[in-house]
Amino acid sequence: MVTGRLTTTISQKTKVAQNNHLHIEFKKMSIQLNLDGLSFCIFNPGLSCIESIYHLSLPASMPPILVEQEVQKYLNEERALCQDFDTIKVLHNNEQFAFVPEKLFATEHLFEYLKFNVAEYRNQIISHDTLSGEKMINVYIPNAAINRVLRETYGIFEYEHFTTTLLGVLLMHNPQKKDAIYTHFD
């Protein structure tokens, strides 16, 4: 199955508190999927602060069905993760990606772009992000099982590959495109 970047805007949540005062929540959550687990960051833009950070460690050798169960269990147990969020962004941080020049990109060739970087890519969902200012496409394999658990829990959300976000931030700090070297340690 092939998909492009999935985007969702979850509408602002308005609730009536117990004392009948109108309460508006403006909270954002980002979730980073790494090879060793998931990290959750809840940000309150109204207060301009990070409210909480959580991490769920998962062994790389754990079977996918058990990973799904552990993630679902964790999401149900952590109260702060059980609330409504205005936006949710998921970053897939894995080595299963390839950058492709925009001029050479065609959705019917997604498998071809990954065949040199990814050992096992058949029967996988392949997605892609666009770095329009750089005229590049990042083709990658998201973790479909965890995306499914997150979709069942939160509804629709936006996801992209970690390197798309990282490259976007780095390039934002170098608008004149001067020679620069960046390193990232994971």
Question: What residue spans do the PLM features occupy?
Answer:
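Hydrophobic beta-strand segments of well-ordered beta-sheets in folded domains
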Residues: 29, 83-90, 186
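A broad structural signal for short, well-ordered beta-strand segments within beta-sheet-rich domains
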Residues: 26, 47-53, 67, 85
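Small-residue (GG/TT-enriched) beta-loop-alpha framework at ligand/catalytic clefts
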Residues: 2, 37-38, 49, 127-186
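Extended intrinsically disordered, low-complexity coil regions enriched in Ser, Thr, Gly, Ala
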Residues: 42-63, 107-110
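Gly/Thr-rich phosphate-binding beta-strand-loop-beta motif of the actin/hexokinase/Hsp70
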Residues: 2-47, 173-186
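Internal amphipathic helical hairpin motif
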Residues: 65-80, 88, 92-135
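Short acidic, S/G/P-rich loop/turn micro-motifs used as interaction or catalytic elements
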Residues: 37-38, 57-62, 96-99
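Short beta-strand segments
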Residues: 32, 90-93, 140, 183-184
